[in-house]
């Protein structure tokens, strides 16, 4: 995020909005809805607002990354937002630490081949890494000390 001089960010995460609001050159669009106190995010039916937007790149996190099930998340409300944002984005990048791999949560978001890139840490075993790559998605593993 530091390399961008001007950036418009669309989020339903209050925490992300607060962090990004510290950058005066960024525009933050916080999508409204019902507050999920546990996740500190807003969820509800705000699909009309999302339908009017275009996203160049969507960065999203998930609860599970499974080679055959795909990308999953715990909350139906959050999953609905993620699915719609994937549809309006030119490019989707998933950020998931290695503990999320091989897991499938409650709500299926999409197949792995439906996203452009997955970025994870160096804790992924080589067998799982190969299974993910076999789905056709670009997998980038960031090892300790790499940027």
Model regions: which residues?
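Conserved phosphate- and dinucleotide-binding cores of soluble alpha/beta proteins
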Residues: 8, 15-147
């Amino acid at each position: 995020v530091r390399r961008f001089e001007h950036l418009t960010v669309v989020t339903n995460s209050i925490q992300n909005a607060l962090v990004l609001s510290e950058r005066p050159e960024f525009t933050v669009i916080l999508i409204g809805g019902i507050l999920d106190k546990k996740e500190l995010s807003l969820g509800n039916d705000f699909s009309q607002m999302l339908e009017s937007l275009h996203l160049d790149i969507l960065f999203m996190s998930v609860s599970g990354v499974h080679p055959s099930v795909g990308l999953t998340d715990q909350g139906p409300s959050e999953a609905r937002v993620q699915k719609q944002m994937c549809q309006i984005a030119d490019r989707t990048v998933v950020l998931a630490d290695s503990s999320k791999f091989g897991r499938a949560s409650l709500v299926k978001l999409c197949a792995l081949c439906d996203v452009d890139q997955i970025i994870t840490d160096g804790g992924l075993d080589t067998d799982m890494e190969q299974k993910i790559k076999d789905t056709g998605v670009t997998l980038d593993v960031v090892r300790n000390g790499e940027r």
